[in-house]
Amino acid sequence: MRWSALPLYRSSRPLNKVSRDYQNVTSVTEQVMSIRNRSNLLVYYTGDEPDGHQDPPSAPASAAVLINSLDPYRPSSLCLNCQDYLFNDYVFGTPILMPDVYPTGINPNFSVVYNTPCTTEQGCCGCDNCVGVFEDIRNRMAEFSMRLEVLGWDRNTTLWNVPQGFGSAEYVNSSYRLRAATDADLNSSDTA
């Protein structure tokens, strides 16, 4: 369950308001109760990039505990946006961690959204400290795997990859993407 997707199609509220629903106990309870008996439900998707939105670090874990109390048969997952913003705090207790890496079609040095430079210390270019190649996904997965091992959480937290490409001109032109992903991005290791 992705808290930003389910209500988005049933509501006229802005996405940023809807996507924070995972912090609302009543909303989470209603949504879990409405779908928990489905045989095709694999996993609950708690927070969509809570680190990038600076949600309270305890919010994803609180949602996961609530979800597990309502449906103990399915795990919850968490999708992180940032490379290293309060990683330990956000990931604590997460059964499935999904790094959200969008390397293709970005400008890794300058944010067109915020009109600011992106460095290792600051800035949001859509992919923290990426160079704009498909290997950024592999590198982030390896880095998160190593962090989980160092923390001793590698046996309790599974990594799932969520590479994404966007073809909508509306999305590409209004976000961090300078262009949509191409076949070459998927087939070449050196495409920027």
Predicted regions and their residues:
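Glycan-processing catalytic domains of CAZymes
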Residues: M1-A192
